[in-house]
């Protein structure tokens, strides 16, 4: 279908960040916030060549005069006009390519509604005139990136967490679990517990600082109660962090109390099961004959699985839930923050994949519903 010399574009649209680049590369060229900002008041920026909307980093830096919107909520696109702006920005400003010259591989959340897949397909062919496109499930791409076709993926990003069992390259929809608890909630929780310590973080700018503290200093305790005891009786776990204004703050048990919420959602006032139990529940919804393969191939993916100690803790928790003789292996690839994108880069450059693309011709003949026949 497509010439060998034209690289496919791979775009992974997350709730928090958009990752984009060229198939065959080992990392995305562009990573920017999935936000669209519009001026709060017309004419505030007279003479500044004011645009009617800003995307990504530019929206982030001008947020004082803008109203910011996230078009992707909990992994699912909810605002198509803004989503179109993000894609336009991706192609023309970040990658600087003409989308009508490249096949485009997009990613979607597990259990993405059918209408959404059709809308994505329609926008790619009708607005951007792409010659070919494909929609792949994010967790499946992460599994490919780890060199597997069977396993269970715990994918936790900024807006949503999923556990997705995959057998021979196909996600098993009946066993997919979704948990609306992810990076954004952990940042909010850290803001809250730092406020209890007497530090005030309230504005969106301060929220970015807290996110940085979370990414640099937080970790998952192997034994939460014991870690709390250690923190209470010594200062060995305390770390200091310098704020942009030069003030230095000290953070102690908050370092592991924050990510503990993914194992104990009750910390956030949520009634759901933690990620370990959710993973176990997903496995138990699968055929008894494939469970062994899932336990032995549990792959972590997404930015919110980057906490040090999370793999060991998962190993411990799942071992406690699983049958006693079961072999359990948690795989935490170092590049897992971008493993969805990397899996897409691998998939789109496989020679065997080239016949899988939906071509413009097929789209013109069948319409948007073609996506359900060709992407599964």
Curated annotation (Swiss-Prot):
Entry annotated with the keyword Cytoplasm: yes
Modified residues (N-acetylaspartate): 3
Disulphide-bonded residues: none
Modified residues (Tele-methylhistidine): 74
Modified-residue entries (N-acetylcysteine), positions: 2
EC annotation from Swiss-Prot or TrEMBL: 3.6.4.-
Entry's family note: Belongs to the actin family.
A GO molecular-function annotation: hydrolase activity
Annotated CDD domains: ASKHA_NBD_actin
Residue list for modification Methionine (R)-sulfoxide: 45, 48
GO cellular component, one term: cytoplasm
Catalytic reaction(s) noted: ATP + H2O = ADP + phosphate + H(+)
Subcellular locations according to the entry: Cytoplasm, Cytoskeleton
Keywords attached to this entry: Acetylation, ATP-binding, Cytoplasm, Cytoskeleton, Hydrolase, Methylation, Nucleotide-binding, Oxidation
UniProt name for this protein: Actin, cytoplasmic
Source organism of this protein record: Biomphalaria pfeifferi (Bloodfluke planorb)
SMART domains: ACTIN (SM00268)
InterPro entries, per the entry: Actin (IPR004000), Actin/actin-like_CS (IPR020902), Actin_CS (IPR004001), ATPase_NBD (IPR043129)
Modified residues (N6-methyllysine): 85
Post-translational modification: Oxidation of Met-45 and Met-48 by MICALs (MICAL1, MICAL2 or MICAL3) to form methionine sulfoxide promotes actin filament depolymerization. MICAL1 and MICAL2 produce the (R)-S-oxide form. The (R)-S-oxide form is reverted by MSRB1 and MSRB2, which promotes actin repolymerization. Monomethylation at Lys-85 (K85me1) regulates actin-myosin interaction and actomyosin-dependent processes. Demethylation by ALKBH4 is required for maintaining actomyosin dynamics supporting normal cleavage furrow ingression during cytokinesis and cell migration.
Function: Actins are highly conserved proteins that are involved in various types of cell motility and are ubiquitously expressed in all eukaryotic cells.
């Amino acid at each position: 279908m497509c010439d060998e010399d034209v690289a496919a574009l791979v775009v992974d649209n997350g709730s928090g960040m958009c990752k984009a680049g060229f198939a065959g590369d080992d990392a995305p060229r562009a990573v920017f916030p999935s936000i669209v900002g519009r001026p709060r008041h017309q004419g505030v920026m007279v003479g500044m060549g004011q645009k009617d909307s800003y995307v990504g980093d530019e929206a982030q830096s001008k947020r004082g005069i803008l109203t910011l919107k996230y078009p992707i909520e909990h992994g699912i696109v909810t605002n198509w006009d803004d989503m179109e702006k993000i894609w336009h920005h991706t192609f023309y400003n970040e990658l600087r390519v003409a989308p009508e010259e490249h096949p485009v591989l997009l990613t979607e959340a597990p259990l993405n509604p059918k209408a959404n897949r059709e809308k994505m397909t329609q926008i790619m062919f009708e607005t951007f005139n792409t010659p070919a496109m494909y929609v792949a499930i994010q967790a499946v791409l992460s599994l490919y990136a780890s060199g597997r076709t069977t396993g269970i993926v715990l994918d936790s990003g900024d807006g949503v967490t999923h556990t997705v069992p995959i057998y021979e390259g196909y996600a098993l929809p009946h066993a997919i679990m979704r948990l609306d608890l992810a990076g954004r909630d952990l940042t909010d929780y850290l803001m809250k517990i730092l406020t209890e310590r007497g530090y005030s973080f309230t504005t969106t700018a301060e929220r970015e600082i807290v996110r940085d503290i979370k990414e640099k200093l937080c970790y998952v305790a192997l034994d939460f109660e014991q870690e709390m005891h250690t923190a209470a009786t010594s200062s060995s776990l305390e770390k200091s962090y310098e704020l942009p204004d030069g003030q230095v703050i000290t953070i102690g048990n908050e370092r592991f109390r924050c990510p503990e919420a993914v194992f104990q959602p009750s910390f956030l006032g949520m009634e759901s099961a933690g990620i370990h139990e959710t993973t176990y529940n997903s496995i138990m919804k699968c055929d008894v004959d494939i469970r062994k393969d899932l336990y032995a191939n549990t792959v972590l993916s997404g930015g919110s699985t980057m906490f040090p100690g999370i793999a060991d803790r998962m190993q411990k928790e799942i071992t406690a839930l699983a049958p006693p003789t079961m072999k359990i292996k948690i795989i935490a690839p170092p590049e897992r923050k971008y493993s969805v994108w990397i899996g897409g880069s691998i998939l789109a450059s496989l020679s065997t994949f080239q016949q899988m693309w939906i071509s413009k011709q097929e789209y013109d003949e069948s319409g948007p519903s073609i996506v359900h026949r060709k992407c599964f």
